[in-house]
From Swiss-Prot:
Subunit-structure text: Homotetramer.
UniProt xrefs under Pfam families: Chorismate_synt
Gene source species: Desulfatibacillum aliphaticivorans
A GO molecular-function descriptor: chorismate synthase activity
GO cellular component, one term: cytosol
Taxonomic classification: Bacteria, Pseudomonadati, Thermodesulfobacteriota, Desulfobacteria, Desulfobacterales
SUPFAM superfamilies assigned to the protein according to its UniProt record, in alphabetical order: Chorismate synthase, AroC (SSF103263)
Function as written in the Swiss-Prot or TrEMBL entry: This reaction introduces a second double bond into the aromatic ring system.
Family under the similarity heading: Belongs to the chorismate synthase family.
Name of the protein described by the UniProt record: Chorismate synthase
Keywords tagged on the record: Amino-acid biosynthesis, Aromatic amino acid biosynthesis, FAD, Flavoprotein, FMN, Lyase, NADP
Pathway linked to the protein: Metabolic intermediate biosynthesis; chorismate biosynthesis; chorismate from D-erythrose 4-phosphate and phosphoenolpyruvate: step 7/7
Amino acid sequence: MSGNTFGKAFRVTTWGESHGPAVGAVVDGCPPGIPLTEEAIQVMMDRRKPGSSAASTTRKEEDLVHILSGVFEGLTTGTPISLMIKNKDAKSSSYDQFKNLFRPGHGDLSYQRKYGIRDYKGGGRASARETAGRVAAGAVAGLLLERVGIKTFAYTLELGSVRAKNIDPEAVSKNPFACPDMEAAEKMEARVNEVRKDGDSLGGIVQVQAAGVPAGLGEPVFDKLDAQIAKAMMSIGAVKGVEIGAGFEAARLTGSVNNDPILEDGFETNNAGGTLSGVSSGQDIVVRVAVKPIPSISVPQQTIGLDGKADTIQVGGRHDISAIPRVNVVCEAMLNLVLADFVLRQAQVRALELFAKQ
């Protein structure tokens, strides 16, 4: 299986399965001299770990990250950084009933038909557990970005058709749904409780942004900044759509409205979402991500078995009601990885200038 590595200059490979002994990531290309501790990474990991919100699974994982290599006396050495998170609360026996059945909405059927074999205990690499490695690596990337003045953050814009109307960044940390609108957060909680009684699940929208991004990040044509952001977000299992800036709303605007007027001190608007022709403009990067409902639900569903015959399935078990808000930090981590990669690639573009100044 290929496709487990992301990035060119700042490269991340994730590894491990949901019900294996551990999951993790290897970060290759991180510059030396960046202060890095397990505690610094853990801050981001704690936002993703199970049981962190009313909509999350009852599976209890500490998600403690262990740095195995690439750090000496608290500083990165420039060599590969290996990160490991042990799985401690996997209950594989609960998946035995799915050995010969395909779960709707999961990768069971497509993996079986691609590889002729699948990990039916938790979904293997298709499990959301894989994202723990992404978040750990994204935390490392975030520390690199801090050195150049870039800050990323994410919040719940919408959950179960309840949308935040008032955006107060300080409210995000004050409610279990990471919503910037406290009134909307209360409605989200009511909606989650309602759907939980039905054994169903919810989707929503995450907004992730980056401030302090300098102009010049991104490459022409196939490696555009917005193209790589879209790829990064769409690589998250629960994500079904991405828009940047005005996004799909831009299709309804005239050019005179959609264009961002250029002023002496910047731009008047940000419909472009911080990118022009695939290169950062110096404005904030603004991304919205559509997250599908969790496919593991207690509602009876039609399916087929390995023998191809019709059957009925009820998944149940310890599953999230919604991937939100745990997926928020995953989106933030992926934006970190994209930006860290382009920061290092831009340094290569201007390398002659840097050496000439020495």
